[in-house]
Amino acid sequence: MGKIEAINITNISEENTFYVNQAILEKGKGIVNDSYYENFKEKKEQVTLINLEDINNFNNEIRQNIDAKDFRRNIIVSGINLNELINKKIKINEITLKIHEICQPCKYLQDRLKIPGLVKMLVNKSGVRAEILSSGSLSVGDVIKILK
């Protein structure tokens, strides 16, 4: 089982993201009050998740302390390997998510954080994209269950 460590949204695309203690996820729409709510290209992009362990490892590698929110993923988790969950479902309270694919880092993030080589360093360590199959609310500290 995993755990939600933080929830991260932005009201305006490409603006700074910020933490919230809880969020409402709506099937087929995304995270309420997030700039991408009802504004994603594909259903698999409704929500993003990233492992806190990958963030910590990256920070150790570059000897900096980049805040988890600066990676611009919606849900920061611990205790589960997200990359192993491609095409699987997870449950958080009444919410069911289907993990579709690994998010690869983008040059936008590298330029924004001003870290040369970031894209290469974060290949396969930059989170996953998921589809919301059932609506509900989640909070920091909630448990994540992997469905069979």
Predicted regions and their residues:
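Metal-cofactor-dependent catalytic cores
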Residues: 1-148
